[in-house]
Amino acid sequence: AIDGLNVLNVQTILSEVGTDMSKWPTSKHFCAWLGLAPNNEISGGKPLRTDTKPVKSRANLAFRQAAQALANSKSALGAYYRHMRARFGPPVANVATAHKLARIVYAMLKTREPYHDPGADAYDAQQQAKLLRNLKRNARQLGLALVPLPPATSVADLGVFAT
């Protein structure tokens, strides 16, 4: 089961979409049809607008409603929603999470395999590793080296405020 998707949402999605995913070659086509894919219009290197395509689809609304329900979920999708909300705000986080849910549902219906949620802790660990990897890369580009601090019990143990 996917967190955020209740019985009513699943029924709405399946009644709109069906179970045959051969209509859409990839999940990108599926998400674009739903109106959940980013619509980046760029002219001369300048972004003009980055909204999603407006569509009248009950499945679109069901995915957005499911994404909103993930705000307090202790799953990887809930952690993703909270991460995006902190970076970009609630409206963008809602659409991004709905887009992710749509890709998961597409993959489930296409491959007929269940979804396995790794959990919020796994997502947070992945984000922490990504942050550390980027920090090391940036330090290397600046000609610096990262030195891990030994586990200290207090600030005085670090010798920063030596008297």
PLM regions: where:
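Low-complexity, acidic/Ser/Thr- and charged residue-rich accessory regions of DNA metabolism proteins
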Residues: G44-R49, Y81-T163
